[in-house]
Amino acid sequence: MSGGVIRGPAGSNDCRIYVGNLPPDIRTKDVEDVFYKYGAIRDIDLKNRRGGPPFAFVEFEDPRDAEDAVYARDGYDYDGYRLRVEFPRSGRGMGRGGFGGGGGGGGGGGGGGGGAPRGRYGPPSRRSEYRVIVSGLPPSGSWQDLKDHMREAGDVCYADVFRDGTGVVEFVRKEDMTYAVRKLDNTKFRSHEGETAYIRVKVDGPRSPSYGRSRSRSRSRSRSRSRSNNRSRSYSPRRSRGSPQYSPRHSRSRSRS
């Protein structure tokens, strides 16, 4: 297999992530399928080292999407290979150096060389006053599930969920918040585990009781999810309002999510 490159303009290290411990037969399109749902991709550089597992660099348009991808995909089981996903160690204050280790195949860990601290990457940190409260979420609904669902209304800059089945979502623009209440209230929500529920969406008041509660499932990163469960996740790509989206092709028979 030869590595493939999808080229785009250069960007910040905050937008670029390292993906290690890939299977030997991985293709650029396969890497794309794993990461496209987290945001617009600018560049995928897939490399195949002689005597070692392939690795790739994926560059997003938005650094918040890169954080989402690291949080959600580090440790992800891909055809028996546990992916190692982190920011390049020359960026984000990690110092300079190579990527030690890389892990073995067949579910071996991505050990060696360290990496970003576990649990560092939670919901995106950018905040907005254009906030809605969502209620009626199923127990397995995560902040990423909620963010994906609400992207149907526009650009989401923050999302989180709480133990009582409520969540908070913040939009970049006021009109997106208004559209979300009008179009997504009482719609069917589907979690990454396939649980469905009809949710209610309303504009957050100045003293919302749900905002700021302690989190539980929003921060947990499950490493035991099956690929079939991940395939069931319903993703809605962000509406294009600026730069063109990186448009994946989904004609392969082995579609991975």
Swiss-Prot record:
Residue span(s) of domain RRM: 15-90, 130-204
Species this chain originates from: Danio rerio
Any one of the GO BP annotations: alternative mRNA splicing, via spliceosome
InterPro entries the UniProt entry points to: Nucleotide-bd_a/b_plait_sf, RBD_domain_sf, RRM_dom, RRT5_SRSF_SR, SRSF1_RRM1, SRSF1_RRM2
GO CC, any one term: nuclear speck
PANTHER family, sorted: RNA RECOGNITION MOTIF RRM DOMAIN CONTAINING PROTEIN, SERINE_ARGININE-RICH SPLICING FACTOR 1
Record bears the keyword DNA-binding: no
Family: Belongs to the splicing factor SR family.
Protein name: Serine/arginine-rich splicing factor 1A
CDD domains: RRM1_SRSF1, RRM2_SRSF1
ATP-binding found in the keyword field: no
Gene name of the record: srsf1a
Function statement: May play a role in preventing exon skipping, ensuring the accuracy of splicing and regulating alternative splicing.
